[in-house]
Amino acid sequence: MAHSNWLYQTRDIMFQIKEWLGVDKLLSLDAYKDYYGMDDINSILDVNYKVCRDVMCPANKDADEPGAKFVGGNEHAVVTPDSFKNVYKTVMDAELGPQFGYRGEGKIPLCWYAPILEMQSAASPSIVMFWCLTQGAITVLHEFATQKQQDLFIPKLRTGEWGGTMGLTEPGAGSEVGAVQSKAFPTDTPGKYKLTGTKCFISSGDHDLAENIIHLMLAKTPGAKEGTAGISLFIVPKFWVNDDGSLGAWNDVTTMGIEHKLGIHGSTTATLSMGENENCYGWMVGEAEVKDGRGIGMKQMFAYMNEERLNTGLFSLTLHFFLSCCFSCFPNSHNIQ
C-alpha cells in the first residue's frame, strides 16, 4: 500500500460522531465534561489521519516483505522492519496508541477511539496489532489489579515503552480454554508464583518495538478445579520488573517461533514457552485468591477478550471499507497496489 494509495476519507466519520451519534450529550457527562469538547475530536482525527497517511501507510509494504523475522535467542528473538520503529515511535509520541485504553480520570470516550483505530488498521493491519493488545492489557489491569500492580505496570504500558499480550491459547487448549495445562506454583512471597507452560498464537507475543512485554497469562494453581472454574490470571513480564519499576533479568519467557498470518505477515504472532529453565515468575492479578479450587481468571480475561473481539470486528469492517475505496478508484487508476 504505497503512500499514493491512501484513499481514506474522514467526512463519514465526522458525520457519524457529530451529527448522528450526538456525542455532545456524552461529553456533558461528569467523566468527560472537564476534559473534552467537540472541537477536540477534530484535532485528534486530523493528527491521526496525517500519521496514517504519511507514516503508517508507506511502512505497510514492509509488513509483507520483509515482514517480521524470527531470529531466535532468549532476549531478542524477533526483529521487525526498521520502518516499524519509526511508526511505533510516531504513534506513541502522538498518544494515538494504548493511551486510549486508560479508563481512569480524564479517559477519552471510546467512541472516539473507534475511528482512530479504523484509520490505523486501514493504513497497516499488521502494525496496529502492536498497540491494540497493549490497550487490552491496560483495561484488565485497571479493572482488576491491585493499586501497586497498576502503579508498577500501567504507566509504561500507556506510553508504549512496554507492550502487553493476551496469554490464553495453548497447543491443546484453544476454544476449550478450560483445558489449559499451564501451571502456577505459589512462592514464599504472597501473590508471587512460579509458572510453567506453553502459549501459542499470541498476538504481538515478542518484538523489538518495546523494551519489555507484559504477558497476562492464564494458568492453574495446584488443586484447582477442572475446566474454566479453576483458572487464574497472572502478570508475567518478559523481563522481571523490580519494585521501583526498573527492569531486572530475563524472566525465562522463550519465543519458540512466529506464525505467518494471511495479510498480516508483519504481525508477530508467537509461540511462547514459560519456565523452560524453571525460572519464570509472575503475579496473580489483583487480590484474588484461589478458594476451594476456584479462580477468577476467566472473568478477568473476558474483559480483554471482549475488547479484542470488538477490535477484530472493526478491523474486518475497515478492510471492507478500504477495499471499496480501492475499487471505486480503479476505473481512474491502475496503480492501486
Each language-model region and where it sits:
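Alpha-helical support elements that line or immediately flank enzyme active sites
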Residues: 313-324
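Active-site-adjacent bridging/hinge elements
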Residues: 20-30, 84-93, 110-113, 192-195, ...
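A short core secondary-structure module
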Residues: 192-250
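N-terminal glycine-rich flavin-associated loop
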Residues: 129-147, 174
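FAD-binding glycine-rich core of flavoenzymes that anchor FAD
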Residues: 119-124, 140-164, 188-191
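A glycine-rich, basic-preceded beta-loop-alpha segment at the flavin cofactor/substrate interface
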Residues: 201, 240-256, 261, 271-308, ...
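Amphipathic, small/basic residue-rich leader segments at the start of a protein or domain
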Residues: 1-128, 132, 148, 152
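Flexible, glycine/threonine-enriched loop-and-boundary segments that flank and lead into catalytic domains
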Residues: 71-90, 96-101, 165-189, 198-207
